[in-house]
From Swiss-Prot:
Organism: Mesorhizobium japonicum (strain LMG 29417 / CECT 9101 / MAFF 303099)
Residue ranges occupied by any TGS domain in the UniProt entry: 1-64
PANTHER family per UniProt: THREONINE--TRNA LIGASE, CHLOROPLASTIC_MITOCHONDRIAL 2 (PTHR11451:SF44), THREONINE-TRNA LIGASE (PTHR11451)
UniProt record similarity statement: Belongs to the class-II aminoacyl-tRNA synthetase family.
Name the UniProt record assigns to this protein: Threonine--tRNA ligase
Gene3D superfamilies registered for this protein in UniProt: 3.10.20.30, 3.30.54.20, Anticodon-binding domain, Bira Bifunctional Protein, Domain 2, Threonyl-trna Synthetase, Chain A, domain 2
Protein EC: 6.1.1.3
Residues covered by region (Catalytic): 246-549
Single GO cellular component term: cytosol
């Protein structure tokens, strides 16, 4: 063929095709059944419309509805159908943007009267009608002038702004489904009929145009869409369970923390919540000691000159909290900022004193308080805050030590997650983005090392740990590993990171003396296990639904009396429990025992020891455990021994068994 392309299929076979053949034609040439199932195709990982010509050689895949990548297409197409339905029902409504998000999509609308959930049934009915029409998605490329004229005639002023924001060298793509069309980069499935009916509108919210509070407020409609009804129902069940486990609700019930208007995005920790926080810190501190980390503490407030050197002032200034010294009338004009990250401070500590290659690796760890501005609408309990604590560490090592240090970090991260009950973990390697610092040779070297480490992680786990590569998703200063854990109801949370940094050591002139007596730049590795410790605690609260294992519970035991005649004995029991290292309190109130048990169960106390006149006489306790109706009567000494053993932390249990 004169204009042919060479395609490599997933089975490794290679065939030549006419470059003008479309993805649909390719699927048809393979089999009619595949052509019926196809919703898109991909060349070299880039998903394309079935109507697109092949155009170039590469690895090809036909995407069907059961492919994970089809979900994004289903959701994208459903967003377009939502927009068409709204404009059919309420002519004059302006459409703005409608992206795919995790587990669904949203679309922002400009309308004098905001939408409410009461509008959902009629919108969903209209959406089903549009899907049933099975109109093909067609694509055209318009000139900038034509696009602006058409959308201006339609009164779509927000689309005009979007057109102006598109770089001149990029095509303006218009996707139509029947008579309705929208400005869109694509790709889309072949027709609206391929969407199916496994979708649901979820909620409405206000959203400023372009996220700027100076712009008009729009109405955002959120929705979800899935490949089939079973997936949709499973998702709805998960949401119901997530609502029951909401850490904000459990935080109130367990008296752990609260938020208030005077401190948006910062946590007011109550005694029990702070105890839980300290339990996590103490556990992490012991794990770091095992691994040879040095715990340090860098200043909270630093001059902007340091942030300029680090690059944060240029890259991150809008998210930093700035302060001046001693008010406006001081003669000191220096500008300071609360630290958004711990890393520049750790470089200063590494630089303090001459380092030899024999001193490496140097591992500096900090439970560092950092502050980052988040829009008020983005704040969400412990999960999204403005002030939080990072379990941050930075390893300064030689290039030869990089692989072994990454593996040590990996082992620490995985064992930590296992101790907290997370055993479904995936590790993603994010590689070089388009905008980056460092030479291609340095990136090649680092990515080769981390790719080898990733393969070792996979094989050592017997393929239990899922690994993948995120092309172009690395930070501007180096490639990174992202650790994603799955919780009890199937949600995924990205927590841990291991990140190579080419940037900061060079910017700050950090060096060590090599074996040849020459100055050498160390490799710097950023490492976090929890990430934000507040967020990690929120994840733990929801994962356990407040039913913490005894070793981690902020309140382990309550001794509740049936009668005032047992008050003295209950006080003695609490004293002995505390002497054994358990967190225990007495409930001597003049209330019925069922009321006490119900109240402490709501507060998620793992163990309630009930004491009455008989228990006092026999030196026994009646044990009731959270979530169980069973009762067990044991002698006091035996009960204390049993609970003390159960409360041993996993790391101490391992050390004891070694």
């Amino acid at each position: 063929m004169l204009n042919s392309v060479s395609l490599t299929f997933p089975d490794g076979s290679v065939r030549d095709y006419d470059a003008a053949m479309t993805g649909a034609g390719l699927a048809e040439s393979i089999s009619k059944s595949l052509a019926k199932k196809a919703v898109a195709y991909a060349i070299n990982g880039t998903v394309r419309d079935l109507s697109d010509p092949l155009g170039k050689s590469g690895k090809v895949e036909i995407i069907t509805r059961d492919d994970a990548r089809a979900l994004e297409l289903i959701r994208h197409d459903t967003a377009h159908v939502l927009a068409e339905a709204v404009q059919e029902l309420w002519p004059g409504t302006q459409v703005t943007i409608g992206p795919v998000i995790e587990n669904g999509f949203y679309y922002d609308f400009a309308r004098n009267e905001p939408f409410t959930p009461d509008d959902f049934p009629v919108i969903e009915k209209k959406m089903r009608e549009i899907i049933a029409r099975n109109k093909p998605f067609t694509k055209e490329v318009w000139s900038r002038d034509k696009a602006k004229k058409v959308f201006a005639d339609k009164g779509e002023r927000y689309k005009l702004e979007l057109i102006d924001a598109i770089p001149e060298d990029q095509d303006l793509k218009i996707y139509a489904q029947g008579d309705w069309f929208d400005l869109c980069r694509g790709p889309h499935m072949a027709s609206t009929g391929q969407i199916g009916n496994a979708f649901k509108l979820m909620k409405v919210a206000g959203a400023y145009w372009r996220g700027d509070s100076n712009n008009p407020m729009l109405t955002r409609i959120y929705g979800t869409a899935w490949a089939d009804q079973a997936q949709l129902e499973a998702y709805q069940t998960m949401l119901e369970e997530a609502e029951k486990r909401d850490h904000r609700k459990l935080g109130r019930e367990m008296d752990l923390f609260h938020f208030q208007e005077e401190g948006p995005g910062v946590v007011f920790w109550h005694a029990k919540g702070w105890k839980m926080f300290q339990n996590l810190v103490n556990y992490m501190r012991r794990r770091l000691d095992e691994q040879g980390y040095q715990e340090v503490n860098a200043p909270q407030v630093l001059d902007k000159s340091l942030w300029e050197t680090s690059g944060h002032w240029g890259w991150y200034r809008d998210a930093m909290f700035k302060v001046t010294v001693a008010g406006d009338d001081t003669d000191d004009d220096r500008v300071f900022a609360l630290k958004p990250m711990n890393c520049p401070g750790h470089v200063q500590i590494f630089k303090h004193g001459l380092k030899s290659y024999r001193d490496l690796p140097v591992k500096l760890a900090e439970f560092g308080n950092v502050h980052r501005y988040e829009p008020s609408g983005a704040l969400h309990g412990l999960m999204r805050v403005r002030g939080f604590t990072q379990d941050d560490a930075h390893i300064f090592c030689t290039e030869e030590q990089l692989a072994s240090e990454c593996l040590r970090i990996n082992d620490l991260i995985l064992s930590t997650y296992a101790d907290f009950g997370f055993d479904e973990i995936s590790v993603k390697l994010s590689t070089r983005p388009d905008k980056r610092v460092g030479t291609d040779e340095a990136w090649d070297h680092a990515e080769a090392i981390m790719g080898s480490v990733l393969e070792t992680i996979r094989t050592r786990s017997g393929n239990r740990i899922k690994t993948s590569i995120n092309p172009g998703e690395g930070a501007f200063y180096g490639p990174k590993f992202e650790y994603v854990l799955k919780d009890a109801i199937g949600r995924e949370w990205q927590c841990g990171t291991t990140q190579v940094d080419f940037n900061l050591p060079e910017r700050f002139g950090a060096f060590y003396i090599g074996s040849d007596s020459e100055k050498k730049q160390p490799v710097m590795v950023h490492r976090a296990i929890c990430g934000s410790m507040e967020r990690f605690l929120g994840i733990l609260i929801e994962n356990y639904s407040g039913h913490f294992p005894l070793w981690f519970a902020p309140q382990q035991v309550v001794v509740a009396t049936i009668t005032s005649e047992a008050d003295g004995y209950a006080t003695e029991v609490v004293a002995k429990l505390k002497a054994a290292g358990l967190l225990a309190e007495a409930d001597l109130r003049n209330e019925k025992i069922n009321y006490k048990v119900r109240e402490h169960s709501l507060a998620k106390v793992p163990v309630i020891l009930v004491c009455g006149k008989r228990e006092a006489e026999e030196q026994t306790v009646n044990i009731r455990r959270l979530g169980s109706r069973d009762q067990e009567s044991l002698g006091l000494a035996e009960a204390i021994a049993q609970l003390t053993e159960e409360a041993v932390t996993p790391d101490r249990r391992r050390k004891r068994a070694a």
